Amino acid sequence: MRYVSTRGAAPSREFDDVLLAGLAEDGGLFVPETWPVFSPAEWRALRGLPYAELAARVMAPFMTGGAIGFDDLQAITRASYRGFDHAAVVPLVQLEPSLFVLELFHGPTLAFKDLALQVAGRLFDHVLSARDERVTIVGATSGDTGSAAIEACRDRLRVDIAILHPEGRTSEVQRRQMTTVKARNVLNIALSGTFDDCQDLVKAMFADAPFRTELRLSAVNSINWARIAGQIPYFAAAALALGAPDRPVAVAVPTGNFGNILAAWAARQMGLPIERFIVGSNANDILARFLAANDMRTAGVVETVSPSMDIQVSSNFERLLFEALGRDAPETAHTMVDFRASGTMKVSREVWQSVRRDFAGLALDDAATLAEIARIRAESGYIADPHTAIGIAAARAAAPVGVPVIAAATAHPAKFPAAMHRAIGIRPGLPPRLDDLYDRQEHFVRAGNSLGEVETLVRHFAHRNDA
């Protein structure tokens, strides 16, 4: 399996190189040169498998030709999911006759990011050991990616990891899950700015060729294709449980950076009959506006009770745009560069309508989100975190008639105690292993929204660990 850049000016790569590079040299995102497709019989053969084995079989086609054989991958997925809190790893819960919640929060940091990142951390170890190399991972987080990435990479011998988070713009639980990790190879940076500022600085570090080479930069944000590959299996597992490939399904996902719903779309590229992809947004509604009216204009980031979606620039949308443009890399590059410069994405009506055929969207403000949390609990007894509640509302608003819809539950409600208390008057408890989270000492450094300042911090950190 080889990968190409969405912007067309970088050489094609095999999976191992894509894993370690994260972002293509031309600023584009890697995508498979051709999509692997399973036959209906091959999909049916995966029904009923333990999740770790299903995950390995779904991911395997993306990793051919490198250091990771199938037996290696299966050992990695088994180790990755052994510590999850639920035997099914990703259980389905039925809320309504045709509405099913896919719980993705049973991992070590209580968020869907664990499912891909626990695998990615071990993939890094495997490939770097085979090459006798070391990398510095830099990433930006709006809340959940940071803690999941740190948990996946802490104390690994060949990886240093530096994570930027927007100071004061995550929940306290999200912040503490990052900053209370004490490991020599972990650096937490609290940035004065928004998530988009953090993400821009990460992209700028990758664009700084001497810095990128000096520190051997890599990424575990969803710009890294390994993250997307690690998220496809749970949508496949849910679809198979509901009758696919012999029955169509729909998927609803609370969406910030567009990676999770892109993984569901990738599952369809692989042959699963997923009929509609439903985007749930908060007041930062750029994706919902685009889907409704071809209006993708950035605005100031609004702080909400669903902070993981407090994003204006959804990096993974570039991968879908590349496909919608018929894999026209120069046009993709032009569109993305213009979007970055002007704050407005301009696509033709034909391209917009091609996206609209598959995608729908709904945006909820904070009041509607809190009301939806209360409604879900009153009607079903289910306690959904703010992001999940938005996804459920989107599912109910836009699901195709007669088609079961899978709503992704992306985080445990205990990660957002203040919002949950406002909505339903309770603060859901953390699992026992996190009982002392509020008593643990925090470890982080503050930085201004300055590339030079952040690069200095990361360089000092990485070189200290090289010594």
Question: Predicted regions span which residues?
Answer:
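PLP-dependent amino-acid enzyme catalytic core
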Residues: 1-467
